[in-house]
Amino acid sequence: MTFPTLPAPIAAALEERGYAEATSVQAAVLQPEAAGRDLVVSAQTGSGKTVAFGLAMVPELLRGEERIGFVQSPLALVITPTRELALQVSRELEWLYARTGARVATCV
């Protein structure tokens, strides 16, 4: 499955990283019926879960815009069970949202 229409900065980040099409995990979280819902995903390492997680936040974070304007409080909070996973999520979100003006902070 190819990626659905995404804001240009997100699409460019995916293309730069070599993502030509969505993995099955990414496709599942991008389905319209998943929008705004809490999701539980279980899949093998390397299946694209972390990027899927970042893509699922696009509508809420960008709200149809290409950049995130100045905000005084966090727009999202990601809690992980381990330090290593927190750092992995942070790295993935940083490149995925780099062109949007988003700032990613990690507390471990």
Task: Show where each model-derived region lies.
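Conserved nucleic-acid-binding Ia/Ib motif block in the N-terminal RecA-like helicase ATPase lobe
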Residues: F3-Y19, E66-V108
